[in-house]
Every structure is written in C-alpha cells, then in structure tokens.
Amino acid sequence: MRVLIEENYREMSKKAALLVASQVILKPDSVLGLATGSTPIGMYQELAEMYKEGEIDFSEVTTFNLDEYYNLPPEAPQSYHYYMKENFFKHVNIHPARTHIPDGMAGDVEAECQDYEEKIRRSGGIDLQILGIGPNGHIGFNEPDERLNVTTHLVDLTEETIQANSRFFDSPDDVPRKAISVGMATILKARRIILLASGRNKARAIKETVSGYVSTKVPASLLQTHPEVTLIIDKEAASLL
C-alpha cells in the first residue's frame, strides 16, 4: 500500500487526476471504477480541464460506478446518476452507452445486481478503481459489519452514513435507507485501486485502513490485501498516521 500525502484538497485532487489520466493515456479503452461523494469532485474537475486542454480523450473509456441509492429516481439531484452527469460526464467526451451506474429503481433488485456484475465481467474487469472512504471506514456502501457481501448487493445504510449524507438532502428523514453497492470482492478484483481522503474527520478511518487489523468492521482495511493500492490523502486526513 502506497500512501501519498498532499498539502491540501486541491493538491490531492490534482495528483489523483494525473494518475487517472496516465491510466487512460496508456490504455485508451480503460475500464474505470468511479466513486461519488464530495471527495472526488475536485479530481473530476481536474480531469474535465485536462480534456478541454486536449490532454486526454475519454471516447473509448468505459466506467462503472460503485453505488446508487435505492428507490431514488435518477433525475433526483441527490442521485449518483445526476451527480456523475453534472460533475463529470457532461464535461468530457465519454459515450453515455459506456457509462454504468446501478439502477436504483430496478423492480427486481437481485437481477439488477447480478446483471451489473456480469457487465463488469464482460468488460474485462476494472483497470483502475477510484474509492472514497467514510468516517466509519466504509467503501462504497459496504458498511462495517460482522460479514460483508462480496458482490453487488442491496444494503441497509447505517445511521452514521445516513447522518453523514443528510447534508445533501433537506433533512435526514429524506435520505434513502437502502442502496445498491458493488461488493468488496468485486472492488478488490480491480487491477489498481486509488483511495482518496480529505479532512480531519477521515483521519481515524485512514489510520485503521493503513495500519489497523484487517477486519470487516473497517471495510477499507481489506485494501491491505490488494497488491496495487495507492492512498492519496491531504495532511488533515493523514494527521493520525
């Protein structure tokens, strides 16, 4: 596990964008695993700027997002479909048919989860997976638990995650209680992984990810078992290392 500590959020975002750009330049038909939340926004902005400057081409890239809220329409401003369109997809030349996000409105959730796994498999697997991390160490919506689902699944969100995400909604009561999330085994099959973290509220989770016991109680700690993981974090997130 490689840990890169940057001065601040902007420098963290720039470093992450450079690593993603290098992947796409070296392999134009890369399959990228993408994350949402506040942390990757700066990285997406940097990548969009690089595209505008003619430094990177996304026309052959395929993407798979980690998760989506269950029973939240894709046009809702809090949905990850909306997030990805507004923060990244509409700013670059990625083909809509090559972008994949779990269908939170699927009538048959189990079939949707199986289909999502099959799409990842048919694509050849994830070349580079981008991850954020929750204050409790969750990855995607893989919440701390006695055991974790290995593949894409429907998950009950913890109260801590609901409260953390309530800033995107009018109130905590409006936050969906369930989400569809790619599982940890699928995440760990990615050839390379980059995890981003910014802010002092992520410091304990980062410490446990880097040097804690490997445990499903801290899902991010499972990254210790992967041979190609890079953490890009700012000084505040690194404050307990």
Swiss-Prot record:
Catalyzes the reversible isomerization-deamination of glucosamine 6-phosphate (GlcN6P) to form fructose 6-phosphate (Fru6P) and ammonium ion. One of its GO terms (cellular component) is cytoplasm. This is Glucosamine-6-phosphate deaminase. GO terms for molecular function: glucosamine-6-phosphate deaminase activity; identical protein binding. InterPro entries: Glc/Gal-6P_isomerase, Glucosamine6P_isomerase, Glucosamine6P_isomerase_CS, NagB/RpiA_transferase-like. Pathway: Amino-sugar metabolism; N-acetylneuraminate degradation; D-fructose 6-phosphate from N-acetylneuraminate: step 5/5. Keywords: Carbohydrate metabolism, Hydrolase. It comes from Halothermothrix orenii (strain H 168 / OCM 544 / DSM 9562). The keyword tRNA processing does not apply. The active site is at D67, N136, H138, E143. It comes from the Bacteria. Its EC number is 3.5.99.6. It catalyses: alpha-D-glucosamine 6-phosphate + H2O = beta-D-fructose 6-phosphate + NH4(+). The gene is nagB. Belongs to the glucosamine/galactosamine-6-phosphate isomerase family. NagB subfamily. SUPFAM superfamilies: NagB/RpiA/CoA transferase-like (SSF100950).
